[in-house]
Design a protein with these regions (language model features):
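An N-terminal boundary/leader segment
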Residues: 3, 18-77, 302, 309-311, ...
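Gly/Ser-rich catalytic/binding loops embedded in alpha/beta enzyme cores
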Residues: 24-200, 218, 305, 310, ...
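Sec-dependent signal peptide recognition
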Residues: 2-9
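Short helix-loop capping/hinge segments that flank enzyme active sites or metal/cofactor-binding pockets
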Residues: 24, 95-118, 272-283, 333-398, ...
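Gly/Ser-rich, acidic/histidine-flanked active-site/gating loops
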Residues: 106, 112, 236, 256-338
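Selective detector of the "anchor" transmembrane alpha-helix that sits immediately C-terminal
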Residues: 573-592
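Structural helix-boundary/capping segments
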Residues: 60, 137, 187-279, 301, ...
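Cytoplasmic C-terminal tails of single-pass
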Residues: 596-601
């Protein structure tokens, strides 16, 4: 706790002394993408301001986190164009003009793809990766490229030529890897989404360690062209987000499929717990079966109770685990495929490095590539052995799903206590069922331990069953939601209560309860000038030095107008009553005169 307080003091010193950051009448760290677009509709944000607010967060905090390698210098200009198009034709879809951060092994035209190596700082791709093309078709803005474990080599950390990525919730701890920068960026609200890649656990492990959602889809469901490969037999690109609904929006864009993430329940769902992965069994031997960190067990068992109370049929698979499957899962083909894949990839870039050999020989490598270079020729015998193990494993898992009528298997993303930065541990990653079999799996926030460190729970289902997986994690999110902004990276500005109150007035419309006839009688209560003043306040929010006092003044003006109109209406009612009485008297008088006239005739 003392450490956190010291860091907080340091951060606030940074915030107050570096520059005056932009502000808005809404706190972007509390908004999902639907609320962001609504704020733009209400005039509280422009796309240009939105991008600036995210850039401010990167500037304020990232010197301590190292989550970002490069910024898209055209992001603000793209946002300005968005504002002009929005005024002219509206918004075509919910993702339009929203920012996303992508891992720096994914090609974005105009930005270097370094894979975490300064040796590739001049490697500019000739075209966007296929996934980037699809995001841009939706109108999204690539905001930045995220740091990663160099060449996607390590799961225990994200260390590259550009520094070590630190955990979003505690700088002394690891972000995990290799997509650590992407996970930390979303946790810190640098952007609503990020893309990462997953070979063995590279997307899901960092997501778990940073309290965000990391989705690995079925192998080959998403086109990976334009992504620097590690192991082409299991590499997958996927979305990282704070919520399930936001996650599905990105996966829909990348796959072309539609996923229903409306309210879902656990009713009728059978969720199988892999007890061996949860509790471990020392009789089997090996690090992979060591005892699980007690706080993970506590959080996991609490989550199971919540799922069961919500209607899930929880079953326990005590006999699922076999250590040979873990061995098969963690031996990737990266050593053989990486070399050939890079030699093909680099041809489509401006890099001075033209081969894997030259990359291995380059200075500044955090991790040696020579072992991979030595394996550049594929070992056919080893490949066949691995494929046979995978097929055996695949048949086994399919049999288990069918035997117990399972909808999803669930287990902790990791058994171990979160590692400190640069702490060595060879077995921290997610279990390799999903990558070795090409199955979809997602890491969801499990909760925080007694030190405030985040952990994840992983759900896995069968091939091409992303829809059911989204249904299950939607139900999970409803009963075990843990999203929160790291205390050491708070919002850069506060939204005063007066501004929130003024927004309520603005959104409900200025109502002074005047009948339409009043407009004929007087202009004293015309609300249009005040409406314009309020709209100008929100439009030019950053130009107002004291937004709290200005908002209070506008609220007072509105309330005064309401009070005066109420008094006017009361007086008017009295006048109307008198007019009615006078009219009745006149009618009675005229009626009597008419009767007298008739009698005379």
């Amino acid at each position: 706790m003392k450490y956190i307080k010291i860091v907080l003091i340091f951060f606030f010193a940074v915030i107050t002394n570096v520059k005056a950051y932009s502000k808005a009448p809404v706190d972007i760290t509390k908004l999902d993408v639907y609320e962001i677009q609504e704020a733009i509709d209400n005039g509280y944000l422009t796309y240009e301001l939105l991008i600036q607010l995210y850039l401010d967060r990167i500037e304020a905090y990232d010197s301590n986190y190292n989550a970002i390698i490069s910024i898209n210098e055209e992001a603000l200009n793209e946002a300005k164009k968005c504002d002009l198009e929005y005024e002219e034709q509206g918004r075509p879809n919910v993702l339009w003009c929203l920012p996303i951060i992508v891992k720096d092994n994914i090609d974005v035209k105009g930005m270097a793809t370094t894979v975490g190596a300064k040796a590739l700082a001049d490697s500019f791709p000739n075209e966007d990766a296929m996934v980037i093309k699809k995001l841009k078709e939706k109108g999204m803005i690539i905001l930045a490229k995220s740091n990663m474990s160099q060449y996607a080599f390590k799961a225990g950390s994200s260390v590259s030529s550009y520094g070590t990525v630190h955990n979003a919730y505690n700088l002394a701890y690891s972000s995990y890897g290799s997509s650590g920068g992407s996970a930390v960026a979303v946790a810190l609200q640098y952007a609503p989404f990020a893309l990462g890649t997953d070979t063995n656990s590279s997307l899901r492990a960092p997501a778990a360690a940073n309290n965000v959602i990391g989705f690995r889809s079925t192998l080959n469901l998403i086109d990976t062209k334009g992504i620097v490969a590690y192991d082409i037999t299991r590499d997958v690109v996927g979305p990282i987000s704070k919520s399930v609904a936001e996650n599905a929006l990105i996966l829909e864009t990348l796959t072309g499929n539609s996923y229903d993430v409306s309210d879902s329940t656990f009713e009728g769902k059978t969720i199988a717990v892999l007890d061996q992965f949860l509790y471990g069994d020392s009789s089997i031997g090996g690090i992979a079966t060591s005892s699980t960190y007690s706080e993970i067990v506590r959080l996991f068992e609490d989550a199971l109770i919540k799922m069961e109370e919500a209607g899930a049929n929880i079953i326990h698979l005590e006999d699922f685990y076999s250590y040979k499957y873990e061995l098969a899962g963690n031996n990737t083909m990266g050593g053989w495929t990486m070399c050939h894949a890079f030699n093909d990839y680099i041809k489509g870039t401006s890099s001075k490095i033209s081969s894997f050999y030259e990359l291995a020989a380059a200075s500044g490598n955090i991790y040696s590539l020579w072992n991979n270079y030595d394996k550049c020729s594929v070992n056919i015998s080893y490949t066949k052995t691995m494929e046979n193990k995978k097929e055996e494993y695949r048949n086994y898992v399919n049999t288990i799903f069918e035997k117990y009528a399972i909808d999803a298997i669930v287990y902790p993303n990791s058994k171990n206590k979160l590692l400190k930065t640069n702490e060595s541990n060879s077995k921290i990653a997610s279990y390799a069922i999903a990558p070795v079999l090409g199955l979809p799996a997602v890491s969801m926030p499990l909760g925080f331990d007694n030190l405030g460190l985040a952990y994840g729970i992983e759900f896995l289902t069968l091939k091409n069953n992303e829809q059911e997986l989204y249904e299950i994690i939607t139900a999970y999110e409803n009963v075990n939601h843990h999203s929160k902004l790291p205390e050491i990276a708070p919002a850069l500005y506060e939204v005063p209560e007066s501004v929130d109150k003024l927004k309520e007035i603005h959104e409900s419309g200025l109502k002074v309860n005047l009948p339409p006839v009043i407009k004929i009688l007087t202009d004293d209560f015309n609300v249009e000038p005040l409406e314009n003043k309020i709209a100008d306040f929100f439009l030019n929010y950053n130009d107002y030095e004291d937004v709290d006092e200005t908002a209070k003044s506008l609220i007072k003006e509105y309330e005064t107008l309401k009070d005066e109109s109420s008094v006017y209406i009361k007086k008017l009612k009295k006048i109307i009553v008198l007019i009615i009485i006078a009219t009745i008297i006149l009618l009675i008088f005229l009626s009597r005169r008419l009767k007298k006239a008739k009698r005379k005739n």
